């Protein structure tokens, strides 16, 4: 019976957690006395903090939000990446010596000069939160939102209310502009928030259903694919979900 790489990796990871190997691998053999501040607790910040702690540095991570994790906590919806998985890793990091300072934005709540006085090294892992915007009429209207803000607020609601999504879109029609993974996450999130209908605009042309001759293996296949959010929308709503070679010129 064939098995997927995902299943193999999941088994290895869960076995390591169950046997305490993850925590064991993070315990430093010695401390070198050097204090490091890591600004940002997204994937890069967490990876950096973990490795520096392994090497014996005294690491403190500064995060402006109320939970560590950055993109993994706020940018990826809970149904795609359950937040307890992120929290599990953060808990182990704390147990092996990494410290987290939350609700603290560098440059607002604490300043660079202060960090320089307290730490011998500073790592900037602040991520890329500036989204691509649309400079079209009506962009400023209420209800027109950037995906990064929408998904962040949706996750904060889930963290506040458990795994139950708010129903702020109940009975409303939603248009998602963009056909990538983030757009797919927005579709799935809107469904869970009670949207009456969801449609999508994609600026590129629809890929072919089969791999073209000029796109042989091992190149990444340029073929049409349907994400989990799109599959859900196709099941729930009538009509064509995605309109290709189309973008918004105004709201």
PLM feature spans:
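Local cysteine-cluster metal-coordination motifs and their immediate loop/turn environment
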Residues: 1
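Glycine-rich dinucleotide-binding loop and its adjacent helix/turn
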Residues: 8-30, 55, 91-108, 131-193
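N-terminal Rossmann-like FAD-binding beta1-loop-alpha1 element of flavoenzymes
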Residues: 35-60, 182-193
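Glycine-rich FAD pyrophosphate-binding loop
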Residues: 57-73, 198-208
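Short secondary-structure boundary/capping segments
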Residues: 76, 139-140, 214-219
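Cofactor-cradling patches in redox/metallo enzymes
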Residues: 77-80, 84
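A Rossmann-like FAD-binding core segment of flavoenzymes
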Residues: 84-132, 155-164, 191-251
């Amino acid at each position: 019976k064939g098995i997927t790489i995902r299943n193999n990796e999941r088994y290895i990871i869960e076995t390591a957690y169950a046997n305490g190997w993850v925590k064991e691998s993070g315990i430093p053999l010695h401390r070198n006395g050097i204090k490091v501040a890591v600004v940002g607790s997204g994937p890069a910040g967490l990876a950096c903090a973990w490795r520096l702690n392994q090497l014996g540095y005294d690491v403190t991570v500064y995060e402006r939000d109320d939970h560590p994790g950055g993109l993994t906590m706020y940018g990826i919806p809970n149904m795609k990446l359950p937040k307890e998985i992120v929290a599990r890793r953060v808990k182990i990091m704390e147990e092996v010596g990494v410290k987290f300072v939350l609700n603290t934005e560098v440059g607002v709540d604490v300043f660079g000069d202060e960090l320089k006085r307290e730490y011998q090294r500073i790592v900037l892992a602040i991520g890329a939160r500036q989204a691509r915007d649309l400079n079209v009429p009506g962009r400023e209207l209420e209800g027109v939102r950037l995906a990064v803000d929408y998904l962040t607020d949706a996750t904060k609601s889930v963290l506040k209310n458990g795994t139950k999504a708010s129903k702020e879109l109940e009975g409303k029609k939603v248009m998602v502009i963009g056909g990538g993974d983030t757009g797919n996450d927005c579709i799935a999130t809107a469904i869970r928030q009670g949207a009456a209908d969801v449609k999508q605009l994609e600026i590129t042309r629809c890929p072919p259903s089969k791999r073209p001759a000029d796109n042989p293996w091992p190149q990444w296949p340029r073929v049409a694919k349907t994400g989990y959010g799109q599959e859900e929308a196709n099941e729930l709503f009538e009509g064509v979900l995605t309109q290709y070679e189309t973008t918004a010129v105004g709201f």
